[in-house]
Regions:
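Basic, polyanion-binding surface patches
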Residues: 1-192
């Protein structure tokens, strides 16, 4: 049946966007609006926010994927606009290697991004960026440096305009294509 809501979040990863902030050196904000294809990533944040203004100005940022153990820091980053949220949440970081934005130490994945295109729509600004570097916590990669998807446990954002909640993965996982006897290869899917 049709639902009447102005917002619908159907399970998006919560991200911490790190950016250069001349008042505080670096700062962070939360978002659940992102996607990545190849070496491109797109993130969306509210137009005229402190983060949006600074990312527009400096054309670079980081995407940091937190886990549930630091949810209190995630919420501080989301509820205190224009303040020194890195200091308030006691977030530790290192500057990026290719961008002047923070790589957050307690996040399981961090991505350094350079803005390529900016699209404003409906009170939100979408930053389309090229990925310059990916940094992953040791516990989620194997000996060959490949991501262990089974160990990856981000926070998901689900809800509508009336209620929003955080969700987490359970321990169940399956390889892509297992349900139909296929596998995903670099050059495309194979079956049989």
């Amino acid at each position: 049946r049709e639902i009447d809501t102005k917002k619908l979040y159907y399970g998006f990863p919560v991200i911490l966007i790190g950016y250069k902030d001349p008042k505080w050196r670096y700062n962070v904000t939360t978002s659940s609006s992102s996607y990545s294809l190849g070496d491109m990533i797109t993130v969306g944040i509210r137009t005229n926010s402190n983060a949006e203004k600074n990312i527009k100005e400096y054309k670079e940022f980081t995407v940091n994927i937190p886990c549930q153990e630091i949810l209190n820091k995630v919420e501080i980053a989301g509820f205190h606009p224009g303040q020194n949220k890195i200091g308030m949440a006691d977030i530790t970081y290192d500057p990026g290697k290719y961008v002047d934005a923070p790589i957050l130490d307690e996040c399981i994945l961090s991505i350094e991004c350079k803005v390529e295109h900016i699209v404003e729509y409906g009170g939100y600004t979408n930053f389309v960026a090229s990925i310059k570097r990916r940094v992953v916590e040791e516990s989620v990669i194997d000996e060959e440096g490949k991501l262990k998807g089974v160990e990856f446990n981000p926070i998901y954002f689900v809800g509508d305009e009336y209620q929003r909640v955080y969700r987490y993965f359970n321990d169940e996982s399956r390889n892509l294509g297992d349900n139909i006897g296929c596998s995903a290869e670099d050059d495309g899917p194979t079956c049989g």
